[in-house]
C-alpha cells in the first residue's frame, strides 16, 4: 500500500493545503485513540481520506481503504502531502509500466452500471483462476460478462488478462455474490454460473447456493435463463438438487462427468484422480412477479445534531446485533464541531466499513452508500437511531 514515514518534529499544518486538483481540507482527530487522525481531502470532485498514525519514532501516513483512489492518483496525493513533512522513507515511486491499468467495478457505481447496461448479462460468481470467465467473454463479444469474486489475487489476475486480451465486454466486481445478486433488478441476467464453490458441509449457512440465493437467481434471470452449478462435492450437489425441487414449477438438467471446452486448474486436478463432477442447471421458466423494492431503499439521513455528551454515549455503545445485520461504531473523529464516524455495519455475509460525515448542515456517507439490500437498509435505519440517540439500550 502506498505510504510514507515522517519525523515527529514538524510545524503544525495550516489547512487547507492546495496544489493542482488536490485539496487537503482539514484534519479530524480521533476521540478514541489520540495517536490517530484522518485527513479529509479531495481530488477534483472525489473525496478521500488519509490515515495519519503517530508511532513511537515516526508518523505513518497512508490511504484509508474505505475511500479508494486509483493507485497513481493516490501516490501523487501522498507525494504532495509529504512535502509538509521531513520524510524518512516512502514507496511512492512512479508506477511500473507492467502494472495493469484495468480496474474492477466500484460497488458504489454498480447500480448505475446495471441500469445503463442494455446487453444480456452472463455472470460468474466466484470465478477463481478466471479461465471459464475469460473464455465466456471471448466467445460472447456482444454480451456483457460479469465476474464476481471476493479473492483479491484472483481479481488482479483476471484484470491483467482482460487488459492483455482487450476484453471490453468483461467487467469484474469485488463483493459477495449473494448480496450483489440481491441488489440487481429482475430479468437482468441470461445465465449465472457458480463453478466449484466451497462446499461448507460443516457450516451450510455459509454456502453460496441456498434457498434465498436460488430465489434471487430465478428473479434476476430472464425467462429460459439458467443458473449452473458445477461441483465435485456429492453432498453439495444433492442438497442443491433438493433446493431446486422445492420450487412448485421448475426445469432441471443434470449431468455427471460431462466434458466441457474449458477446464479449470482445479477441475483438471480432480479429473486426474477420476473424481466425479456434477452439473446442475436450473432454468427460469416464466416472468418472476416478485416485486423488486431495492431501488426504493433510501440511505439518506434525517437531520442530526451531535454534542460532546452524545458523542461520548455513541462511542460507548457496544456493537448492536439484530437478525441478519449489525452496526458497530468503531471510532469518531472531530474537527471544530464536525465529525467523521467510522463504521462497520450491514449484512453479516458481507459487512462493510464506511465513514459518515456530520457537519452543522449535512450528514452523508463518504463516496458510497451501502449496497442496496434489505439487511443493509435495516442496518442504515439502526445507525440513524444510534446517531440520533433513539433506542440505544
Swiss-Prot record:
GO terms for molecular function: tRNA (guanine(46)-N7)-methyltransferase activity. It comes from the Bacteria. It catalyses: guanosine(46) in tRNA + S-adenosyl-L-methionine = N(7)-methylguanosine(46) in tRNA + S-adenosyl-L-homocysteine. The keyword RNA-binding does not apply. S-adenosyl-L-methionine binds at residues 124, 149, 176. The keyword tRNA processing applies. Coiled coil: none annotated. Pathway: tRNA modification; N(7)-methylguanine-tRNA biosynthesis. GO terms for cellular component: tRNA methyltransferase complex. Substrate binds at residue 232. Its EC number is 2.1.1.33. Pfam families: Methyltransf_4. It is an enzyme of class 2 (transferase). PANTHER family: 3-DEOXY-D-MANNO-OCTULOSONIC-ACID TRANSFERASE/TRNA GUANINE-N 7 - -METHYLTRANSFERASE, PENTACOTRIPEPTIDE-REPEAT REGION OF PRORP DOMAIN-CONTAINING PROTEIN. Belongs to the class I-like SAM-binding methyltransferase superfamily. TrmB family. Catalyzes the formation of N(7)-methylguanine at position 46 (m7G46) in tRNA. This is tRNA (guanine-N(7)-)-methyltransferase. The lineage of its organism: Bacteria, Pseudomonadati, Campylobacterota, Epsilonproteobacteria, Campylobacterales. The gene is trmB.
Amino acid at each position: 500500500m502506498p505510504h510514507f514515514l515522517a519525523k515527529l518534529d514538524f510545524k503544525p499544518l495550516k489547512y487547507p493545503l492546495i496544489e493542482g486538483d488536490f485539496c487537503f481540507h482539514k484534519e479530524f482527530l480521533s476521540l478514541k485513540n489520540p495517536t490517530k487522525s484522518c485527513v479529509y481531502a479531495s481530488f477534483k470532485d472525489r473525496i478521500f481520506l488519509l490515515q495519519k498514525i503517530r508511532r513511537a519514532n515516526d508518523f505513518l501516513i497512508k490511504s484509508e481503504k474505505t475511500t479508494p483512489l486509483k493507485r497513481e492518483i493516490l501516490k501523487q496525493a501522498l507525494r504532495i502531502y509529504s512535502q509538509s513533512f521531513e520524510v524518512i522513507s516512502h514507496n511512492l515511486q512512479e508506477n511500473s509500466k507492467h502494472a495493469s491499468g484495468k480496474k474492477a467495478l466500484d460497488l458504489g457505481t454498480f447500480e448505475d452500471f446495471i441500469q445503463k447496461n442494455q446487453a444480456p448479462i452472463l455472470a460468474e460468481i466466484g470465478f477463481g483462476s478466471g479461465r471459464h470467465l475469460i473464455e465466456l467473454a471471448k466467445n460472447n463479444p456482444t454480451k456483457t460478462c460479469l465476474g464476481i469474486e471476493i479473492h483479491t489475487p484472483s481479481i488482479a489476475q483476471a484484470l491483467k488478462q482482460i487488459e492483455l486480451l482487450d476484453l471490453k465486454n468483461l467487467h469484474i466486481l469485488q463483493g459477495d455474490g449473494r448480496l450483489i445478486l440481491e441488489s440487481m433488478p429482475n430479468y437482468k441476467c441470461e445465465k449465472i454460473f457458480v463453478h466449484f464453490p466451497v462446499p461448507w458441509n460443516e457450516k451450510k449457512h455459509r454456502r453460496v447456493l441456498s434457498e434465498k440465493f436460488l430465489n434471487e437467481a430465478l428473479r434476476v434471470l430472464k425467462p429460459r435463463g439458467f443458473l449452473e452449478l458445477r461441483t465435485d462435492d456429492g453432498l453439495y450437489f444433492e442438497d442443491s438438487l433438493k433446493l431446486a425441487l422445492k420450487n412448485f414449477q421448475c426445469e432441471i438438467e443434470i449431468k455427471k462427468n460431462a466434458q466441457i471446452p474449458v477446464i479449470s486448474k482445479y477441475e483438471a486436478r480432480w479429473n486426474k484422480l477420476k473424481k466425479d463432477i456434477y452439473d446442475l442447471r436450473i432454468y427460469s421458466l416464466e416472468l418472476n412477479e416478485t416485486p423488486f423494492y431495492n431501488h426504493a431503499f433510501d440511505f439518506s439521513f434525517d437531520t442530526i445534531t451531535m454534542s460532546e455528551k452524545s458523542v461520548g454515549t455513541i462511542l460507548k455503545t457496544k456493537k448492536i446485533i439484530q437478525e441478519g445485520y449489525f452496526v458497530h461504531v468503531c471510532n469518531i473523529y472531530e474537527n471544530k464541531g464536525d465529525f467523521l464516524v467510522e463504521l462497520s455495519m450491514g449484512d453479516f455475509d458481507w459487512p462493510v466499513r464506511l465513514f459518515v460525515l456530520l457537519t452543522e448542515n449535512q450528514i452523508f456517507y463518504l463516496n458510497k452508500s451501502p449496497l442496496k439490500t434489505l439487511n443493509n437498509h435495516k442496518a442504515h435505519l439502526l445507525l440513524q437511531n444510534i446517531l440520533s440517540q433513539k433506542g440505544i439500550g
